[in-house]
Amino acid sequence: MKKKVGIISLGCPKNLVDSEIMLGLLKKNDFEITSDSEEANVIIVNTCGFIESAKEESINTILEMANYKNKNCEMLIVAGCLAQRYKDEIIKEMPEVDAVVGVSGYDEIAKVIEEFYSKKNDKNDKEKAVFHKDTLSVEYLNNERLLSTNSGYAYLKISEGCDNRCTYCAIPYIRGPYRSRKMEDIISEAEFLAGKGVKEVILVAQDVTVYGKDLYGQKKLVELVREVSGIEGIEWIRLLYTYPEEIDEELIKEIANNEKVVKYLDIPIQHASDKILKLMGRRSTSEGIRNILDRLRAEVPDIVLRTSLIVGFPGEDEKDFKILYDFVRKYEFDRLGVFTYSREEGTPAYDLKPQIKKSVKESRRNDIMQLQKEIVQRKNESRLEKVYKTLVEGVSEDGIFYYGRTYAEAPDIDGSVYFTSAEPLKFGEFVNVKVLNIDDYDLIGEVINESSK
């Protein structure tokens, strides 16, 4: 009898791509895929593990899935970043877990399951399967994926790892150095996605702006974008994530002039105080960040800018926080996320002093998020009565509205557009929506036949 396998994918879009690759490999090896954990014989939790809250979510999910061992679940696998970072602890402290698969072991997932079942009746073999290949290959990304995003968009991972050495971040230790995929492999995957009806391709990496530097000796993102934009069927190309110090004039011009590149950038800035940026090991300066933001706004009309910030980094005093707060107030980001600093063992910032009290970190986060809420309110009001090309993604739970996204919203992290239509709509298609109302971070509108922005 075919074994039913379910995957719970936690964390970032890059992790989702890895989950989709595992799904594709499992399907290829004749496993049955299920989204219902209750009926799964094998449950895989693809974990995130780079900050405390992500680790907690991963551990809680593993324990929750372990409860299904009282039902149909015969095998529980922990994969991904937490598995890579804490394999010994998982093996020792979580007896419910049957196998641990690190970030370089995704392409072995079918083998992991098959070996478990072949040894299941061997009373003498109690050892857990641990798959941690010491490889820097990105070839696993060339395996055919089983898409979990079924409404017109898909992520396309163009590299793995990171060469930045931010003092707070564990990702280079978990995922290894930056490794670009071959351009022809990425183009081939983009063509595959277009053939599946994908209209929006989201190029994703820890830092897309340095794509190609390690492989070709120079940055190749603009060339890659041009190649992808030539693929029939792809209408939107979105870039996640772009480091400010690597955004150059060539890239700005491409974003401004290429109609398929959505005018949206997610630029992780983290702070605006030069003192804190230096302590963080960031390559940017406050002046450099401001210059690139000014250039983007001047050269790319209607560009939507998202950023992420860290408050409560060791040594951040009231003066540093005021610099950050005033920076957010001045630059009025369209989208913004704020993390409180997470003290991660094995990172240089772990031993920095003084560490900031949790209550102070939370207070600073709340202050910036309140400011951002006011900024978003004003920006959303400016979108009233305008018409936007919108990707239809689904129907609301009450069945009254369709929902989707304009160029100004990335999946999962930004708001949505809720809208009515006189005619039935297909998911994964584009319509023109006139914005009539706002609801906090979301927009409300109706489908019309006018041309869109």
From Swiss-Prot:
Residues 381-449 form the TRAM domain. SUPFAM superfamilies: Radical SAM enzymes. CDD domains: Radical_SAM. It is an enzyme of class 2 (transferase). SMART domains: Elp3. Residues 3-118 form the MTTase N-terminal domain. It catalyses: L-aspartate(89)-[ribosomal protein uS12]-hydrogen + (sulfur carrier)-SH + AH2 + 2 S-adenosyl-L-methionine = 3-methylsulfanyl-L-aspartate(89)-[ribosomal protein uS12]-hydrogen + (sulfur carrier)-H + 5'-deoxyadenosine + L-methionine + A + S-adenosyl-L-homocysteine + 2 H(+). Binds 2 [4Fe-4S] clusters. One cluster is coordinated with 3 cysteines and an exchangeable S-adenosyl-L-methionine. Residues 148-378 form the Radical SAM core domain. [4Fe-4S] cluster 1 binds at residues 12, 48, 81. Its cofactor is [4Fe-4S] cluster. Keywords: 4Fe-4S, Cytoplasm, Iron, Iron-sulfur, Metal-binding, S-adenosyl-L-methionine, Transferase. [4Fe-4S] cluster 2 binds at residues 162, 166, 169. It comes from the Bacteria. GO terms for biological process: tRNA modification. Belongs to the methylthiotransferase family. RimO subfamily. PANTHER family: RIBOSOMAL PROTEIN S12 METHYLTHIOTRANSFERASE RIMO (PTHR43837), RIBOSOMAL PROTEIN US12 METHYLTHIOTRANSFERASE RIMO (PTHR43837:SF1). NCBIfam families: 30S ribosomal protein S12 methylthiotransferase RimO (TIGR01125), MiaB/RimO family radical SAM methylthiotransferase (TIGR00089). Catalyzes the methylthiolation of an aspartic acid residue of ribosomal protein uS12. This is Ribosomal protein uS12 methylthiotransferase RimO. The lineage of its organism: Bacteria, Bacillati, Bacillota, Clostridia, Eubacteriales.
